[in-house]
């Protein structure tokens, strides 16, 4: 279970880095094609939980641009 969760965090980080910035809908479409989704969408609450865990574990901030509603990884 923990290994699978860790893999999901890595998938989210890698996906946002690869594309630069993505809306929640775009993340969801890519998520549904991933091996972690079982064909199910990524619930909003789960996305925010993953986002917070990623910040806590990896010190990586996934920010949202309020004008475009796109998520991106804040460069430090």
Give the label of every model feature segment.
Residues 1-76:
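Short, basic/aromatic recognition patches that contact phosphate-bearing ligands
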